[in-house]
Amino acid sequence: KRNARNRDNHKPYMTLGHYWKFSEKLNIQSNFYAIVGKTSNTNLNWFGANDPRPDYYKYLPSYFISDQGTLTGNQTITEQSDYQQILDGWQSNDPNTTQLNWDLMYQGNYNNLYTQNNIGNTQSSLTGKRSKYIVEEYRLDPRHYGFNSFGKLNINEYSDLNFGLNASIYKSKNYRKMNDLLGGDFWVDIDPFALRDFNDPSLAQNDLQNINNIVREEDIFGYNYDIHVNKNELFGTYSYNKNRIESFFGINTSTTTFWRNGK
């Protein structure tokens, strides 16, 4: 058995704490943390081939039911034999109807001998088994480091001062990589939807600096960028409580900077 969609989430969390009792009136607690790992999601993709998903709307019994008569309940079946065959397959839980046909995808890739010209803005070409079906992987690899410190000062029996700071640095690598060519030799990095809508190969290129980019297993393609987020915060509160008089004063200042570094 095999799944087209797999999720792998592995992000270990490390913390280091320190408690400092400076005096009877002043205590400070500090913490450092780090998160390093990855989140991975796989998915099927295809080009120049039929949709392999068994629940694609054209493969369901409802596709063969006419919209006419919907309000009156007098709908008609356009293709009785196809409708009945698919309906029987779903009702009997036939794996040929309800599951992905991996053998068919492998066979389609094996038989697709193709010559790709004009690779990387050059006159070079490549002949091999061009994959029609692939398993691609969407990755988010975070690196998150932070520090915070909190203190409490007992000024006297009526008043206290609380203060602290937070600082964090976050960077995540976001990219798509080739997980499995399903028996093929390479994949060409173009957008099939743009090619369909505009019928212009130049508008379908995902990488304008590398026309007709050839992708092999474990290669990064489609998109590749880093997200950076840096945060800093300072705060303090003063409280006073005596008899029937109670007061509170607080101040907070913070900065957040973020940017995207595309590749």
Tell me the role of every PLM-derived stretch:
Residues 1-170:
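Outer-membrane beta-barrel domain signature, strongest for Gram-negative TonB-dependent receptors
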Residues 134, 159-263:
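Signature of Gram-negative outer-membrane beta-barrel scaffolds
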